[in-house]
From Swiss-Prot:
Name by which UniProt lists this protein: D-3-phosphoglycerate dehydrogenase
EC numbers: 1.1.1.95, 1.1.1.399
Signal peptide positions on this chain: none
GO cellular component, one term: phagocytic vesicle
Function recorded in the entry: Catalyzes the reversible oxidation of 3-phospho-D-glycerate to 3-phosphonooxypyruvate, the first step of the phosphorylated L-serine biosynthesis pathway. Also catalyzes the reversible oxidation of 2-hydroxyglutarate to 2-oxoglutarate.
EC top class, as a word: oxidoreductase
Catalytic reaction equation(s): (2R)-3-phosphoglycerate + NAD(+) = 3-phosphooxypyruvate + NADH + H(+); (R)-2-hydroxyglutarate + NAD(+) = 2-oxoglutarate + NADH + H(+)
Organism of origin: Dictyostelium discoideum (Social amoeba)
Length: 407
């Protein structure tokens, strides 16, 4: 069933930043939504200019959605993060304003894990340096300090969806796997959990990072941690740019303490492709530098585009909030011959009583409610004749944030 919405679909505006996959654009357009797609991220002032009449904002990892932006987004219904992380969005402020944030936590896990396997082999065989030499007309065939990865130990810091999938691939290549995570996680295959990060660093030939961007992970790998690693070992980071202290990594590579590194993320990254990017790690020996491409495969981006756009479409069309990272997750089957009312309110004592006092005056055919931290979210199906009056009464409640007649 596709009921007529109280707000015409062709009036709903979607703003997509950072080159969101065409699959998402098509999915939105098939719903009749207006879609504007921009290939790069935008600075705060430019987003504020555009967001005043935008209903859905889509982005990847570079765009920052701040309190200031959200305060200007008067019509914003939802935010879609077409990536794993959501730390680029002020989730608390979005929650306060009744704006759910959706993401895709699993779709690019395989792509990132495959990249790490590729880089482990490339580093172990010094393929990057050999390729550069050949392009510079230098033929150097040697086996010194080039090794198989079979029998080597991979240490994984962060054993979530990427880390655990990587452990399976690494074992299939003949590697032993150690892992460390602040949460106790069951091992896959023959991987072994370390009691602390120091133990992992001391016993790994390759150390790879798969942690979120939090206060605790900023500068997680610094001089002390790098010095704890085995001499001749390798460090790989495809998680977040601020996790590794770049100057100390560069020193360890130039001194020979580390035999190589692969870095895909950086403390500061350009908002779009450019030709003048600089980093201390440039010219370091046996060092792979890639421009944040861990999840940049056609397969991953298409899957992410479809998943996040589908979650947003479901929210706009039915109010279902499944998959939101900052919102109560509820859904209600569509009921014929009714109007659907959505209400987002402050999660305070007495609010539900006030809402139910209003609803009790009318014929309510179905209702569902859930709360999360600061807010509560209710979906109610009511007689069509009463929907406007109910909306007016609920909207006037002091703790009501948003009330919408969906259809």
């Amino acid at each position: 069933m596709d009921p007529t919405t109280s707000f015409p679909k062709d009036k709903i505006k979607i703003l997509l930043l950072e080159n969101i996959h065409i699959a998402a654009i098509k999915q939105f357009e098939e719903q009749g939504f207006q879609v504007e797609s921009i290939s790069s991220s935008l600075p705060e002032d430019k987003i504020i200019e555009k967001i005043k009449d935008v209903h859905v904002l889509g982005l990847r990892s570079k765009t920052k959605v701040t309190e200031k932006i959200l305060s200007e987004a008067k019509r914003l219904l939802a935010i879609g993060c077409f990536c794993i992380g959501t730390d680029q969005v002020d989730l608390i402020e979005a929650e306060k304003r009744g704006v759910p944030v959706f993401n895709s936590p699993f779709c690019n896990s395989r792509s990132v894990a495959e990249l790490i396997i590729c880089e482990i082999i490339t580093l172990s065989r010094k393929l990057g340096d050999r390729s550069t030499e050949m392009h510079n007309k230098i033929w150097r065939k040697e086996s010194a300090n080039c090794h198989e990865i079979r029998g080597k130990t991979l240490g994984i810091i962060g054993y979530g969806h990427i880390g655990s999938q990587l452990s399976v691939l690494a074992e299939a290549m003949g590697m032993s796997v150690l892992y460390y995570d602040i949460a106790r996680r069951l091992p896959l295959g023959n991987s072994k959990m370390c009691p602390d990060m120091k133990t992992l660093l001391e016993n790994s030939n390759f150390v790879t990072l798969h942690v979120p961007d939090t206060k605790e992970t900023v500068g997680l790998i610094g001089e002390e941690e790098i010095n704890t690693m085995k001499k001749g070992s390798y460090l790989l980071n495809a998680s977040r740019g601020k996790v590794v202290q770049i100057p100390h990594l560069a020193n360890a590579l130039r001194s020979g303490h580390l035999a190589g590194a692969a870095v895909d993320v950086y403390p500061e990254e350009p908002s779009a492709n450019c030709k003048d990017w600089e980093c201390e790690l440039q010219k370091c020996p046996n060092t792979i530098l890639t421009p944040h491409i861990g999840g940049s495969t056609e397969e991953a981006q298409e899957a992410i585009g479809l998943e996040v756009s589908d979650l947003i479409v479901q929210f706009i069309n039915s109010g279902a909030s499944a998959g939101s990272v900052n919102f109560p997750e509820i859904a209600l089957p569509v009921s014929p011959s009714t109007h659907r009312i959505l209400n987002i309110h402050n999660n305070k004592p007495g609010v539900l009583r006030d809402i139910n006092n209003i609803l009790s005056e009318f014929n309510v055919s179905a209702q569902v409610l859930s709360t999360r931290k600061q807010i509560g979210y209710i979906i109610a199906d009511v007689d069509s004749e009463a929907s406007k009056e109910i909306k007016k009464k609920i909207s006037s409640l002091p703790n009501s944030i948003k009330t919408r007649v969906l259809y």
